[in-house]
């Protein structure tokens, strides 16, 4: 592309952005939301005489006219009446998106070049971008207010609106299901409470274990949110007189809890500032515009972003809409192999490598906190990565092979590079909030990487990074309250304390005794690790991802040294194996991606194919790493 071509392209991008902001619904959109909106637009050229909308018909799209002229008419008892003409830059169809029907007919008076936003994509974007929904509501309220004032003869007051953030409420479960969940969550431990404890477990430990069993049933059936069940665990222990409040709630004062708090604040800043979107768009431009090239770009995006954003669901929430916009721009039909390949490249890329980086997942900090003190001091950010990278490479190779040969495209793509360039243009130069977020990331990563030299606990870089974000104004008081998942932190803190309680009452020794025959039957630590990985995969068939990971970590990590394994290898196996799925409904991240793309990107059969293949790749990665871990002294202790 020549300099003049670049100039013309930039002028075109500026014109399109200006055209979007002429629509009342979109005037208050920030640049990040506007960039996401551009990805959903479809460029169309229409010859003169074409009927674009018919009065009374279904409203299928909003049109942004870049060049050309259209005539707007309505039917009257006297015949068709011309209301006027629209000459580009202009728009029409915005009310039809809300009403579902056309209020006038529109004919192309000349050849026109326009951008089309389908009603289906508009509704989808509203779900993905709450700020757009609030902008629509604000615009309608202002129109009603202005008309009421005009009718009453009062002066019209101009208002500046600020888009607010809100999340749609989760779908409610049937009442009978919730009642059954409550009954089993409370009833099963109550029925077993009076029984004698198993061999080698004291009565206090048995009762502590029954409360955890009730929590596991609650997490499976979900009569209430998972963090409510977690909070009920220390409450039940305290009411039963099993542990003191200080012991039950000790997890909220651990370094891992504050590391998680800092990491979640950093995740919120990356999402709000647009830094995550900018990184993904830049990588999509670097790789070839072929289907395989874009899949590699999405995988690479995950490898780059995962250590920077330790929240898998947030990464998927950001990348899933981008994969759909990419599929639309490349012209792939719904639920085709080509579309599924893009979705799963983004999904696998932004989740499969979470256990490889210490900062890849908040739950990694949980495992770190469960390690014996000497082992915890050994595993900094670099040591964790060095120990896990061979498994990560095998998982990456498995992902590439699965996507390349299992989800190859049925048709050749059309170019979609121009859409990415338009989105990057609207994002503009890197903003101050992005710069502050990058500085906070730098503080965190420098503290983690150089921790062995600085001799500073891993907690403090995360806390300092969060302070920088708040002091600089990138996260304000409202953002701190609304953008951090406090429910997850409640669950996280309770389960951090659960490990100490289980050690206090001897449950860890009882589990070690239970696993000892399995270790002897395995005959080698290598085989034992693979067996544990398979058992975790089986456990995930029953329990949801987050509770399963945390609960299995609490149960298995502390007993690793007692059965000839380092606690870290057991923790890594739990993190990696629990991160897989066989049936798509097992995976929180897959269900989130399907919801955000309205099920248009893939089928459950394709999800099963990818899930099964990645489960095999993960198990192979664990098995292949065992000689490496033995060489590092992590096996055969």
Question: Where do the PLM segments sit?
Answer:
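Transmembrane alpha-helix interface/packing and boundary motifs in multi-pass membrane proteins
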Residues: 216-225, 302-311, 347-358, 447-453, ...
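Hydrophobic transmembrane alpha-helices of multi-pass small-molecule transporters
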Residues: 152-259, 383-513, 613-637
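C-terminal ends of transmembrane helices
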Residues: 214-221, 268-282, 286, 469-482, ...
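A small-molecule sensor/coupling module
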Residues: 15-16, 33-36, 102-103, 120-160
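Juxtamembrane and boundary regions of transmembrane helices in multi-pass small-molecule transporters
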Residues: 138-165, 181, 315, 334-428, ...
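Cyclic nucleotide-binding regulatory domains
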Residues: 46, 50-111
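Cyclic nucleotide-binding regulatory module and flanking cytosolic helices
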Residues: 2-48
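Membrane-embedded alpha-helical segments and adjacent helix-loop junctions characteristic
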Residues: 227-333, 484-563, 636
